[in-house]
Design a protein with these regions (language model features):
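Helix-to-loop junctions at the C-terminal end of transmembrane segments
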Residues: 65-77, 277-289, 374
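Helix-loop boundary and gating motifs at the non-cytosolic
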Residues: 8-59, 227-230, 234, 239-256
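Interfacial helix-cap and linker-helix signal at transmembrane-aqueous boundaries
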Residues: 39, 72-73, 160-166, 253-254, ...
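Symmetry-related core transmembrane helices of the 12-TM Major Facilitator Superfamily/SLC fold
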Residues: 170-187, 383-399
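Residue-level signature of mid-helix packing/kink "hotspots" within the transmembrane helices
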Residues: 59-67, 151-152, 271-279, 363-364
């Protein structure tokens, strides 16, 4: 059987992977708008830090499963790991419907972290396997566009359902249907894509980086390579923004007088702009390089967060959410592509797993920072702190990240290295 790469050549399987990641996005989006308000208004949680515990559990578990999911997929294949991710998600709607206290919700989000860590990781790896190096940025852009488009739709749909029928159980019936759909597509229609990555690895002309042991990949992607370190820290800090949207936006905006349905629109605009623009920003990075959109995105997203705390009113908050979404669209798919460029095909899934581990640990770190800041100072103060973190991280990225685009790498200026780790790729 031929394992020739290319999106058009493999369009049927690529489309199924897009459907899969859309379902993954719907799953997390179904929680994003409703669950924090459920904790405050139904389960009686007053501390923002405690509300944030469900994001902490999600983030740290997803981070760990990202790491091992990539490793497992190179041993057992992408499809078994994808199916396992959907099986683990089956109890989540039941837990959310029946939860008598907030800690049940926190446990449910542990399962959500497993689902997202396995299912989304395998979906993006499969698209990279199918697309090949020439269309890698576009493939990742499509993946993230459909995934975060799903987040936006899930947030909006559950907001509408909650506004009409209540915070539970009806919104979580929608979630149950999404999980079943994702599982059926993964089991019945998705094919294994690992052979495409192996065929690509066989064609590599330079093999000095091939077949690195797991520990060496972990070391390189964490601190041994300056560019991968820059990507990992940027990925971790940008998740502070997403944690803020998940934890603080519903609480901050409903306290300011917006309805749950209106909050769903604000959060949906953030996710929708982020998702749709990635159809363009991934391809943009294939044309102009990865580094410019990543650096610009860090500062634009930080500005959007800052703007949210400064303005007042439904339409202004919606506009600020759109600005934040633009920044995330610029940086998010292209950070993944940077890692995909820098990694050898034989250990690319593991390298992406290490990056995604540090990136999604940012949910946990961000939830701690947001919760402590909100409880000690105010919810508004958490917006200022997250914006400052984005600006600082953007500066680090500007200094340390080199260009990784295969056609631009040799001619691009080298990033400044203030006694940091060396580039080894």
């Amino acid at each position: 059987m031929s394992y020739a790469q290319g999106i058009r050549r493999n369009w049927t399987q690529f489309s199924l992977q897009l459907l899969t990641v859309f379902a993954v996005g719907l799953t997390i989006g179904a929680e994003r708008n409703v669950v924090p308000v459920l904790g405050r208004d139904v389960l009686g949680v007053e501390s923002v830090f405690v509300v944030g515990a469900f994001v902490m559990s999600f983030g740290f578990v997803k981070a760990l499963l990202n790491l091992y999911g990539g490793k497992w997929s190179e041993s057992y294949g992408r499809k078994p790991v994808l199916v396992a991710g959907w099986v683990v998600a089956l109890p989540i709607p039941v837990i959310l419907v029946l939860a008598p206290n907030w800690w049940w919700v926190t446990v449910g989000n542990v399962l959500l972290g497993v689902n997202q860590g396995l299912a989304w990781s395998m979906s993006v790896n499969a698209k990279i396997d199918l697309a090949g190096s020439d269309a890698r940025g576009f493939a990742v852009g499509l993946d993230e566009a459909f995934g975060y488009g799903g987040v936006a739709v899930g947030s909006w749909v559950t907001g509408v359902i909650a506004a009409r029928y209540g915070l539970r159980p009806e919104p979580f019936y929608f979630l149950a249907g999404v999980v079943l759909l994702g599982l059926l597509v993964a089991v019945l229609f998705v094919d294994e894509t690992l052979p495409y990555a192996r065929a690509e690895a066989d064609e590599e002309t330079t093999d000095e980086d091939a077949d690195l042991p797991f520990r060496e990949v972990l070391k390189r992607a964490t601190y041994g390579d300056r560019t991968l370190l820059a990507a990992s820290q940027a990925g971790s800090v940008e998740k502070f923004v997403d944690a803020l949207v998940w934890i603080a936006y519903p609480l901050y905006l409903t306290t300011a007088g917006l309805s749950v349905a209106q909050v769903g629109v604000v959060v949906g605009v953030y996710g929708g702009v982020w998702g749709l623009l990635q159809l363009y920003t991934g391809r943009l990075a294939d044309r102009i390089g990865r580094r410019p959109p990543v650096v610009a995105g860090m500062f634009v997203a930080g500005a959007g967060v800052l703007l949210t705390a400064v303005v007042d009113g439904y339409w202004l908050w919606t506009g600020a959410a759109a600005v934040t979404g633009v920044g995330m669209a610029l940086l998010y798919p292209n950070l993944i592509t940077v890692v995909g460029d820098a990694a050898h095909p034989s250990w690319r899934a593991t390298g992406l797993g290490v990056y995604r581990m540090w990136r999604d640990a940012g949910y946990g770190f961000g939830a701690v920072l947001i919760g402590v800041t909100a409880d000690l100072l105010s919810t508004a103060a958490a917006f200022y702190v997250v914006a400052a973190a984005m600006f600082l991280s953007g500066a680090v990225t500007l200094l340390w990240m080199r260009e990784t685009h295969p056609d631009r790498e040799a001619s691009s200026p080298t990033a400044t290295d203030p006694a940091g780790p060396t580039d080894t790729d």
